[in-house]
Amino acid sequence: MTKKQKKMLYRILIAAVLFLAAKFIPMPMLVSTALYFAAYVTIGYDILRKAWKGICNHQVFDENFLMAVATIGAIALAIYEKSGDYDEAVAVMLFYQIGELFQSYAVGKSRRNITALMDIRPDYANIERDGKLEQVDPDDVAVGTVITVQPGEKIPIDGEIVEGASTLNTAALTGESLPRDVMTGDEVISGCINMTGVLKVKTTKAFGESTVSKILELMENSSSHKSRSEAFISRFARVYTPAVCYSALALAILPPVINLLMGNAASWGVWVYRALTFLVISCPCALVISIPLSFFAGLGGAGHEGILIKGSNYLEALSKTKIVVFDKTGTLTQGVFEVTGVHHSPMEDRKLLEYAALAECASSHPISKSLQKACGVELDRSRVTDIEERGGRGVVATVDGHSVAVGNGKLMDELGVKWQECRSVGTIVHMAVDGEYAGHIVISDVVKSDARDAIAALKRAGVQKTVMLTGDIKKVADHVAQELGVDEVHAELLPGDKVARLERLLGEKGKDDCLAFVGDGINDAPVLSRADIGIAMGAMGSDAAIEAADVVLMDDDPMKIAKGIQISRKCIRIVYENIVFSLGVKLTCLLLVAIGIANMWMGIFADVGVMVLAVLNAIRALRTSKN
């Protein structure tokens, strides 16, 4: 409990003692009245001050104004009627402050829970100077500096291990408890906890550009992206509060005036009392507090699972997802390509692979890496000149003075080279040397072990259609789609074709439905940004993915897509539960007040009780079920 909350608790206890003494201990009316006023001022002075400031700043209509008018009006009515019955005025203020304290504590607790879940900010970095370790601010560490990370410490900055081996706990980033073994030469990212050995890490980024900084910035900015529900509640409160104030004024004045015109007693006291109760009930605290809290808790719960959602607007859109479009490589497949065959080559297989690897040496594509791996020797890049990338088709380069073309059938057709079909399932890389066909290499990608379960989980979560887009050949794409149970597949697409195909799918979806695109974030930025929801998988350490996507999965587990949808739908369900419950109870009580059935005690429940229940319900969004 914070210092401010403790102070409020003491005020509540003092006011409660004074209130109970005045209510239940026999004493002269003057003494009991003094105790009531002492209790009222003790518990309500800050509400009265805020209400007065609001009036001075021309921001009249808020919950402080409602509470101040209702309670001062109740006191004035008691004085007018000479009843000495001030207990309702004090009780309204007392229970309102109890509700505010509970709400403050609950929100603070949920914030601390979320902060603990995302407690990845490093406090310092160790730099060795004169044989001793010196702790410095991570912001002061230059790129290329060697830092020491001891067991139990967080890795403060992204870098590469230059000495040592250890096991890393990545749970704060990925939500997974399985540790990761690392050794010299491995890249490590900030935010992971070093569990066993001492590591020396050469930093590759400044702290401000490291993974931990990007994630923290994302989480801190998520509250600025408001959902439609939050925006509606804000607009609703601006209209609702003045409306109920004027309604209460009408309830206090019109019925007595009508009674007078009809020759009956005005009964001013009865109708003013009802109007004051009307004000107590109408306070919109339950909605104004619980709706943002529900989204905040939902974002925190998702973050605990390694699913970073950039704002409540994206959380709301994710809950409406009916179509999920996948980029094949790196999402449904591991993106780890292996050479599985060399066919129809007049050259030696080793020579063919060497030429192919050299021609592709400037590319970062997984196929290029697999060719270099299959070659098995260190490549001398000085043997390669005039490298020309042909988008979506391949590459043409000069290797040892020979013109070497490496790519798909479209590249061979473009160069006028007659090529041969291959019946093997996989990516077929055709080669031509000096304009003559030199054979083809079969490269196969490995389907992720849980990809099929992920597609099934999406169907269970209510996704109506799954689609796969790939630049791979149709035969390979169809094979993968059939194996995984994907509904629709589009193959042999150039990067621009993927955007066009996505546009077509966007036109086919329902008006209120959303389409999510899932990619690895490396070269999917145009498609990620065009989809209703862009989801980047395996983004741990990828700046591009964190920047381009709306939802970032910190590891490459496709099951987390369905998990994210489930979390978002639970959060939205809680939001709607709170809206319906809060408005339902308040409207019912307002009606009962207007016809004289409900009193101010019922008004206290309709305000404070509903707020407490709504806040408790909102906190449920922080908890995520384990599948």
Spans of model-derived segments:
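Soluble-to-membrane junctions at the N-terminal ends of transmembrane alpha-helices
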Residues: 1-16, 34, 45-75, 216-250, ...
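Transmembrane helix-loop-helix hairpins at the membrane interface
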Residues: 2-124, 235, 242-243, 342
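Membrane-water interface of transmembrane alpha-helices in multipass transporters/channels
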Residues: 29-37, 61-68, 81-92, 232, ...
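Conserved catalytic phosphorylation-site environment of P-type ATPases
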Residues: 63-71, 173, 273, 283-359, ...
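Juxtamembrane coupling segments of multi-pass membrane pumps/enzymes
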Residues: 65-66, 91-151, 182, 309, ...
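Conserved cytosolic catalytic loops of P-type ATPases
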Residues: 116-209, 313-356, 398-399
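P-type ATPase nucleotide-binding
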Residues: 339-465, 474, 483-502
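Conserved ATP-binding TGD loop and adjacent catalytic N/P-domain core of P-type ATPases
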Residues: 399-401, 427, 433-577, 585
